[in-house]
Amino acid sequence: VSEESKGEKAAFEIKSLYHGNLRNLNVRVNAGECVVVQDTDNCALRDFLLLLREEKPRSGQILVGGRAVKNVRDRRIAIIQELPVETMIFQSMSYLDNLCFNMDHRFKKVWFSKGIRKSIVSEYGALLGEDVFYKRIGDLTTRQKYDLVYTRILLQNPGVVFCVQPFKKADVSIRSHIWELLERFLKKGIAVVILAVNLADSLALADRLIRIQDGSVQEIYNKEDFVKLPINTPWL
């Protein structure tokens, strides 16, 4: 971990973690910080995601805001999957139901309270567009679908959000919009961890790059050191 991060508040920490291909993994991410984690040999990313989604570590700790994560469904952690407009939107549900899907830990009556739902439409209508709340999911544009997924996570209000290769298959205009959506998390103090095999587009927002090889942290680069990355670094 870089020296400058030690005095700051940790939003997310992994301490001495062993699980699957992960060996003595130590990672710290500060509130409002964007970190790219690159799996250089493509053997750790799957185990890392399984750990966040459904499995407990063999040993070691995972902490959010200094408190241990004991339940894999802990809403303090959010995951934006690879190709989220295909994998994270429920076609059979309304736009508003999709938007509110991760909010029940904050508002227990979100599914039944017209007042809560009306206030969400009022507050986010200007940001998302008033018309989207009345559209069928299949009629949304790609940009509107990205807005839906990322705003759902914003409403969840996690301490950290993990984004799996967020720019994959996105055209140029959508990539720039994804940057804007990620910046919303950062401005709110939410830590962003981009999980990547290749680095195309990912470093534009990053404060640090953590490279993992053989399941352990191999190198850490601060933003000012990105120019020192090896010439054989996989970018595309």
Where are these regions (language model features)?
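Conserved H-loop
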Residues: 189-195
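ABC-family P-loop ATPase nucleotide-binding domains
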Residues: 82-159
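Conserved beta-strand
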Residues: 14-31, 60
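Walker B catalytic motif
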Residues: 164-168, 173
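Conserved beta-strand-loop-alpha-helix hinge in the C-terminal portion
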Residues: 216-236
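Helical segment within the ABC ATPase nucleotide-binding domain
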Residues: 175-188
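A short, surface-exposed alpha-helical micro-motif characterized by mixed small hydrophobic
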Residues: 202-204
